[in-house]
Amino acid sequence: MTKDDIITLPNPHLRQKSSKIHVVTNDVVKLADEMTAAALDWEDSRPHEISAALAAVQVDKLERVVIVRADFERKSTREFITLINPEIVKYEGEIVEDFEGCLSVKSIYGKVPRYSKIRVKAMNLDGEEVRIKAEGFLARVLQHEIDHCNGLV
């Protein structure tokens, strides 16, 4: 996949809820790899921006798969972590309003209120449960991508 496979508004699929994955198959692993390729291709076309994360719906696959950059600080670190069926199990901290961008909403940034801390439950590519305690930018990114899985843009 390339950046051209990333769908944008007003594509109606972005407003549809993604389906839960019950078994991690080779197709799911391939999808995560293709999503990573598309995110990195998008990033390579923008020298001063990073691709923080991507949800499968953004490449027109209505499955609850999210990739999240392993290191937001270094663009040279091109590794992403895959989360399958991510769900927020706890909201914590204060609600903070800050600007967000989206690969599916070209050239528009908007202020969005998000919890400063969350806890997320998901599966990894081995089908094992993972739990993440996130705060700050990671918490914001995870809430954004989980919104995508729920058909929210």
What are these regions (language model features)?
Residues 1-153:
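Positively charged
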